[in-house]
């Protein structure tokens, strides 16, 4: 019986400590914060991938525009040379 009373005392002390900790820190909010932190780090990775994809898409679009401008300039110079060489 002595062992059961010591278990009860230690159990109640343990529960009291838990209650005090949860009362001080807001036990449920602490769990929420830790889960939101892990989800925000996941979102950070996902946003990082999206940012990389957007950056690549922007660079491809820019290179395509540069290539189009260069092509138009070359065509213009060829036409200009052909027109002036004929005259």
Curated annotation (Swiss-Prot):
Subcellular location per the Swiss-Prot or TrEMBL entry: Cell membrane
Record has Membrane as a keyword: yes
Transmembrane segments: 64-80
UniProt KW Nuclease keyword: no
Region (Required for DVL/RTFL small polypeptide activity): 51-82
Listed GO CC annotations: plasma membrane
Biased composition range(s): Polar residues: 1-11
Physiological role: Small polypeptide acting as a regulatory molecule which coordinates cellular responses required for differentiation, growth and development, probably by restricting polar cell proliferation in lateral organs and coordinating socket cell recruitment and differentiation at trichome sites.
Protein name: Small polypeptide DEVIL 11
Record region (Disordered): 1-47
Glycosylation sites: 83
InterPro entries: DVL, DVL_RTFL_regulatory
Composition bias, Low complexity: 29-41
Pfam families: DVL (PF08137)
Membrane topology field: Single-pass membrane protein
Gene that this sequence comes from: DVL11
Biased composition (Basic and acidic residues): 14-27
Keywords for this protein: Cell membrane, Developmental protein, Glycoprotein, Membrane, Transmembrane, Transmembrane helix
Family (UniProt): Belongs to the DVL/RTFL small polypeptides family.
GO BP terms: negative regulation of cell population proliferation; shoot system development
């Amino acid at each position: 019986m002595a062992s059961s009373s010591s278990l009860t005392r230690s159990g109640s002390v343990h529960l009291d400590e838990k209650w005090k900790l949860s009362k001080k820190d807001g036990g449920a909010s602490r769990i929420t914060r830790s889960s939101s932190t892990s989800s925000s780090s996941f979102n950070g990775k996902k946003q990082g991938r999206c940012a990389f994809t957007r950056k690549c898409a922007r660079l491809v679009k820019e290179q395509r525009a540069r290539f189009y401008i260069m092509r138009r300039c070359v065509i213009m110079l060829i036409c200009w040379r052909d027109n002036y060489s004929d005259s």
